[in-house]
UniProtKB/Swiss-Prot annotation:
The species this protein was found in: Bartonella tribocorum (strain CIP 105476 / IBS 506)
HAMAP family assigned to the protein according to its UniProt record, in alphabetical order: HrcA
Gene of this entry: hrcA
Pfam families for the chain: HrcA, HrcA_DNA-bdg
Keywords per UniProt: Repressor, Stress response, Transcription, Transcription regulation
Descriptive protein name: Heat-inducible transcription repressor HrcA
Family per similarity comment: Belongs to the HrcA family.
Its biological purpose: Negative regulator of class I heat shock genes (grpE-dnaK-dnaJ and groELS operons). Prevents heat-shock induction of these operons.
GO molecular function: DNA binding
GO biological process terms on file: negative regulation of DNA-templated transcription
Length: 356
């Protein structure tokens, strides 16, 4: 359904039109149902006849703020109407002390007792429980400090390259060996790499060995040098998107809002999008563009446009104020934005503090 684009006409909406529009949106956010003129007349403080209300609703529909989902139905806000409501009417207040303490207690307990991943999982679970949407955390995999690398020969043409970090993480990869490589050359390449990578991060180790290119050539024969380059390729990983880790909790909450077949199709698209690593990388980029909480409503968010979902998201940062991840709530367009915005904002600030 196409609507007239929202323009400067909205600036000149009279108080009565704004009041009626606000009540339509608030009723929709409360129960997800269209509201008719008779129900509106009971909700409004001022006394207006259903006929007068219908005339105002017609004007609001012409502006693209509301629509009728089917014949003889009441009216619901469009995505553009929800955006206008969020920008013009919504007041995101302070998070209630009870919810603030609840978030802080659960996230801090997880942070003290378990790994970073466990405490990020808890952050997504808390957001899900409090919002009744799906809580998500997008984390960039932090570089570990390297302990050693080893080449284990499998046959004449292949070896298993094993990379171990000080944190106990192990990465294995089968590599192709140049023809004629001896056991002594495998050992020589392993010793050279370990002498220069131990105690460094992946990026630091690559930079260190790149600076030693001439020394490497002088110290190693051609086949051993080839193995060193193979080890460097292993340090490079599989690209930036491989480092992005998505944590989602509360998917079942989204099923509570399903009212029709099209809602199930919307959720199918959403779950497909959440499994796409490229989408997650783009989402992190979008979050990095803003300094605080961002709200994407329906098709405004190109990543989830097919699902028609809304996303409230905020970045969290390291001690150098670099964005290292994002967290938020995703759900139907009738999210309680005024409540969820401060919730997401506070959780992002708390996670940033605990990661420093």
């Amino acid at each position: 359904m196409k609507h007239k684009p929202i323009d400067n006409e909205l600036k000149y909406l009279d108080e009565r039109s704004r009041d009626i529009f606000r009540h339509i949106v608030e009723a929709y956010l409360n129960d997800g149902e269209p509201v008719g003129s008779r129900n509106l007349s009971r909700l409004l403080q001022q006394t207006l006849s259903p006929a007068t209300i219908r005339n105002v609703m017609s004007d609001l529909e012409h502006l693209g703020l509301i629509y009728a989902p089917h014949v003889s139905a009441g009216r619901m806000p469009t995505q553009s109407g929800l955006r206008f409501f969020v920008d013009a009417f919504m007041e995101a207040g302070d998070l209630p002390n009870e919810e603030r303490e609840n978030i802080e207690m659960q996230v801090k307990e997880a942070g003290h007792a378990q790994s970073v991943e466990h405490f990020l999982v808890q952050a997504s679970r808390v957001l899900s429980d409090l919002s009744r949407g799906a809580g998500l955390v997008l984390a960039t995999k932090q570089e570990g400090t390297l302990k050693h690398i080893e080449f284990v020969r499998l046959d004449r043409e292949h070896a298993l390259a094993v990379l171990v970090t000080q944190q106990g993480e192990v990465e294995n990869r089968i590599v192709h060996l140049p023809e004629g490589v001896t056991h002594a050359q495998l050992t020589e390449a392993t010793n050279f790499l370990n002498a220069h990578i131990q105690g460094r991060t992946l990026s630091e180790a690559k930079e260190e060995i790149a600076c030693l290119c001439a020394e490497t050539r002088a110290a190693l024969d051609d086949l051993s040098h080839h193995l060193v380059e193979t080890g460097l390729a292993l340090l490079g990983g599989e690209g930036a998107d491989h480092k992005i880790h998505l944590i989602v909790r509360g998917r079942s909450n989204l099923l509570e809002d399903v009212k029709a077949e099209e809602d199930l199709e919307r959720l199918r698209h959403l779950f497909d999008d959440l499994e796409t690593r490229e989408s997650m990388a783009q989402l992190l980029d979008l979050t990095d563009e803003g300094s605080g909480v961002r709200i994407f409503i329906g098709s405004e968010n190109k990543l989830f446009s097919l699902s028609g979902s809304s996303l409230v998201v905020a970045p969290y940062r390291d001690s150098q104020q670099r964005v290292i991840g994002a967290l938020g709530v995703i759900g139907p367009t009738r999210l309680n934005y005024a409540r969820i915005v401060p919730m997401v904002d506070y959780t992002a600030q708390l996670v940033s503090q605990l990661l420093r």
